[in-house]
């Protein structure tokens, strides 16, 4: 247990850093909005996972018992549309890409969540929440849909700061709404789409409803921290607050939001075509190096991707790794030591990772100096502190997680899972004689540095920059 000062976190509702006081002493409950499993994960997706994994590790180091819930949105318009375009069942499409996200998180040593609920597994809880909202006058039916009445909740806008006169839900004009500022809780069934029976007819859940219902199911009516990307502040998180507090739930007491990964000043997004997939990056750097890069900026700041910045992070990580290896070779085994007070103070100050990393590199410089003058005790002390600090950040170079693999095996394991999903889509397209789509998938893989060869034993792939070939699954 870390004996440090008081943890302070930036709460989006307050617009300021606040002292963190958990609902129950010794326990922290966290809900992180996970992936909508519509496609392959890119580094913008996993930045959120890494950022709040550091928060979780720091809370655990401070002695807290942490319940960490990360959901999976496995039913959504985008999933249905992309699965239909690929000629695949929606549930298969979602499951394939859920596995890809799991592989990406695992490759970067993001700790598994305490629970990872899927939206489709919690339809009953969603229906119960809608019934409560209707009973309390906060929701109404409109045609085959159910909507939340925004005007019925006076505090609407408290998270995002949006004024009622300027609210736009992004749902388009819907005839069943009493007010176009209202948002959808339940979508009436459409031909060919999955649906579930309800008192209002068959249909499927709205996006915002899913998270409120699952957070309630796993963490109760009130919990400590809700996390997610800053792009979710409005409308997603604003609507979560409204529908949960409208039925009397306290819901989240702190709201934390991470910044985007950007390219050329634009948010990394599939719709903009500027995404950088996990396989493409892991072809060039090791998983520990990518994790170091994604976690090195303050979680609330934008992370502008560039090859130069990525290589700077690799160089910094390798510098730490080389120092620890030097000490182990010249002095002996390096155990995990004590965190420095400045490192602890940095993380207590709203997870100021850049300042914490400055302390890591200060210890590296001091440790190298001690090693050079034969001060083995000083070298070991600094090396032990570095292992402790890098462990909190999830990328201790001497941790068996990273040491047990050679330089490329971890990357190849992750790439294998991710590429297999793409090849599965390509094979489906070929079977349907959709040669255009099949060629597009092949070309997309080639752009990421992966060469696909069709053989009598099925497709095989290899990294263009390497010499190891792996049979496709």
Swiss-Prot record:
An annotated GO cellular component: cytosol
Binding residue positions for ATP: 270
Renumbered ranges of motif 'HIGH' region: 35-45
UniProt subcellular location: Cytoplasm
Official protein name in the record: Cysteine--tRNA ligase
Coiled coil, from the record: none
EC number: 6.1.1.16
NCBIfam families: cysS (TIGR00435)
Reactions accelerated catalytically: tRNA(Cys) + L-cysteine + ATP = L-cysteinyl-tRNA(Cys) + AMP + diphosphate
Quaternary state and interactors: Monomer.
Top-rank EC class of the record's enzyme: ligase
Sequence motif 'KMSKS' region, location on chain: 267-271
Entries under InterPro entries matching the protein: Cys-tRNA-ligase, Cys-tRNA-synt_Ia_DALR, Cys-tRNA/MSH_ligase, Rossmann-like_a/b/a_fold, tRNA-synt_1_cat_dom, tRNAsynth_Ia_anticodon-bd
Ranges annotated as spanning the membrane: none
A biological process term (GO) from this entry: cysteinyl-tRNA aminoacylation
Example GO molecular function: ATP binding
Keywords, comma-separated and alphabetical: Aminoacyl-tRNA synthetase, ATP-binding, Cytoplasm, Ligase, Metal-binding, Nucleotide-binding, Protein biosynthesis, Zinc
């Amino acid at each position: 247990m870390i004996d440090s000062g008081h943890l302070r976190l930036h709460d989006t509702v307050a617009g300021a850093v606040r002292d963190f006081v958990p609902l129950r002493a010794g326990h922290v409950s966290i809900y992180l909005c996970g992936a909508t499993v519509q496609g392959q994960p890119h580094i913008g997706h996993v930045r959120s996972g890494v950022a709040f994994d550091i928060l979780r590790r720091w809370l655990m180091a401070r002695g807290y018992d942490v319940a960490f819930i990360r959901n999976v949105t496995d039913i959504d318009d985008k999933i249905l549309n992309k699965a239909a375009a690929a000629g695949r069942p929606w549930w298969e499409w979602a499951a394939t890409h859920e596995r890809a996200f799991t592989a990406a998180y695992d490759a970067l040593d993001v700790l598994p969540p305490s629970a990872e609920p899927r939206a489709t597994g919690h339809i009953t809880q969603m229906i119960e929440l809608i019934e409560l909202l209707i009973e309390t006058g906060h929701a109404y039916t409109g045609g085959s849909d159910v909507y939340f009445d925004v005007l019925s909740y006076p505090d609407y806008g408290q998270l995002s700061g949006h004024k009622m006169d300027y609210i736009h839900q992004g749902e388009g004009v819907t005839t069943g709404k009493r007010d176009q500022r209202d948002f959808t809780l339940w979508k009436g069934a459409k031909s060919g789409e999955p649906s579930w029976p309800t008192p209002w007819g068959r249909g499927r859940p709205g996006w915002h409803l899913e998270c409120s219902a699952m957070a309630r199911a796993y963490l109760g009516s009130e919990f400590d921290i809700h996390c997610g990307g800053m792009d979710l502040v409005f409308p997603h998180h604003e609507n979560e607050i409204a529908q949960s507090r409208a039925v009397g739930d306290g819901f989240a007491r702190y709201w934390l939001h991470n910044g985007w990964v950007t390219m050329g000043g634009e948010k990394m997004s599939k719709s903009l075509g500027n995404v950088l997939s996990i396989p493409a990056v892991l072809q060039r750097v090791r998983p520990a190096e990518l994790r170091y890069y994604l976690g090195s900026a303050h979680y609330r700041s934008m992370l502008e991707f560039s090859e130069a910045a990525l290589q700077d992070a690799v160089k910094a990580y390798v510098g730490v790794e080389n120092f620890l290896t030097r000490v182990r070779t010249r002095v002996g085994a390096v155990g995990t030591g004590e965190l420095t007070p400045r490192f602890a103070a940095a993380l207590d100050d709203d997870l100021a990772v850049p300042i914490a990393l400055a302390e890591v590199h200060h210890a590296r410089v001091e440790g190298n100096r001690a090693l050079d003058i034969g001060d083995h005790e000083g070298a070991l002390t600094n090396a032990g502190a570095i292992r402790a600090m890098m462990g909190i950040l999830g990328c201790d170079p001497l941790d068996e997680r990273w040491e047990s693999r050679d330089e490329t095996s971890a990357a190849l394991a992750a790439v294998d899972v991710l590429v297999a999903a793409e090849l599965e889509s390509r094979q489906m397209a070929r079977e349907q004689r959709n040669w255009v789509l099949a060629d597009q998938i092949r070309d997309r893989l080639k752009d990421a540095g992966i060469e696909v060869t069709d053989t009598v034993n099925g497709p095989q792939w290899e990294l263009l920059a390497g010499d190891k070939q792996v049979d496709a699954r």
